[in-house]
């Protein structure tokens, strides 16, 4: 297995974990901010959409036209960006849970399709140009590696939100 294939598989596995969490919480609870937290399920999912686009598409191969057709990129970057944001929740009048689910799947499909056409040769090349310094990566390998690690980090937050809303932790293999 090549390094790019390994990274792609890790991104797929992390998303499978997120998809399990998504399937376990009713959509009517996605916008509730549990007591003693600052976030809701919907914001976390929106954040994962823009993060995967950023870490695994934009800085790897540049802005992707397919992504722009699926999500309002500029709006979502403002609403769901996690770097220094003061708000980690979103209201239902902005976007519905079903739309977020669909967009989560669509951006992931674009990501995997995009990565499937790449080889290990690109991994240690500089990131595609962006107007600010990438928060953790200097090259494409580091960005792709961070993508799945970041997704698993937020899986823990999503799991805690879900638990605080009365839906217990369910491990993958019972």
Residue ranges and their predicted role:
Residues 81-125, 142-147:
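Acidic/histidine-rich alpha-helical segments that form the ligand environment
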Residues 22, 45, 101-104:
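A generic alpha-helix structural signal
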Residues 8-12, 19, 29-83, 128-174:
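Short, contiguous alpha-helical
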Residues 24-26:
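Short secondary-structure junctions
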Residues 9-17, 102-106, 110-113, 153:
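A non-catalytic, amphipathic alpha-helix used as a structural packing/dimerization or gating element
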Residues 1-5:
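N-terminal export signals and maturation junctions of secreted/periplasmic proteins
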């Amino acid at each position: 297995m090549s390094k790019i294939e390994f990274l792609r598989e890790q991104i797929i596995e992390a998303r499978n974990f997120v998809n399990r969490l998504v399937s376990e919480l009713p959509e009517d609870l996605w916008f509730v901010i549990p007591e003693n937290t600052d976030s809701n399920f919907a914001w976390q999912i929106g954040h994962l959409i823009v993060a995967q686009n950023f870490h695994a598409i934009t800085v790897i191969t540049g802005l992707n036209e397919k992504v722009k057709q699926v999500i309002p990129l500029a709006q979502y970057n403002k609403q769901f960006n996690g770097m220094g944001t003061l708000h980690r929740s979103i209201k239902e009048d902005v976007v519905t849970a079903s739309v977020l689910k669909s967009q989560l799947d669509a951006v992931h499909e674009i990501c995997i399709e995009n990565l499937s056409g790449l080889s290990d040769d690109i991994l240690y090349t500089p990131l595609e140009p962006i107007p600010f310094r990438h928060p953790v990566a200097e090259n494409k390998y580091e960005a792709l590696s961070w993508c799945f690690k970041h997704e698993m980090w937020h899986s823990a937050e999503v799991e805690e939100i879900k638990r605080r809303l009365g839906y217990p932790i369910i491990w993958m293999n019972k």
